[in-house]
Amino acid sequence: ISLGAPLALYYKNDPNAVMQFVKEEDMASAQAQVKLIPYPQSVVMGEGEVAMGHFTSLVYPSEELRDLAETFANHPTASTQPLLALEQGAPKADAAINLILDNTQADEGYELKVTANTIDIKANGRAGFFYALQSLRQLLPVAVYGATREGWAEWTVPCLTIKDRPAFGHRGFMLDVSRHFFTKEEVKKLIDVAAIYKLNRFHWHL
């Protein structure tokens, strides 16, 4: 086998092999137009981009989604004002991030549409909205995960439409703390990072 050629483990040349080594250029998808992990099922780019300072409110349809809205809208530091006003009700036509219930969406799936006027997120329930907001965060500068969000108003997000749903129902990672110890805060941070990448199972070895 030549250097860099695909090599399947366990069942050579079987497309269902458990693991494959591939050439580095094969790993970078020619389809990737935005930096998102995991990459969505569909990404359609629009024209231009919009600054986050254009949006003044985050509208959510029901009280059970308020905490998701608060987490996205609020600064990480409690001493600062929310970046977006929170409103429960119908979607707004301008300057808003709208969470819109849509029963046609797949379980845990969502549609995220960014235009010059609004960011509309459609999902059939809490999980879909959660994953859509994670994707929206990934479209922003990495500073969105920092202790402050200085420059928020100037941050831009591309105009696009994303349609996505999980390829697998069980998406987990394992942490073995019986061999290498972690503090409670470190474990909580790991869970937060797992959520960024839309993992939904925490396998904990104690």
Model-derived regions, located:
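Substrate-binding cleft of carbohydrate-active enzyme catalytic domains
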Residues: 166-206
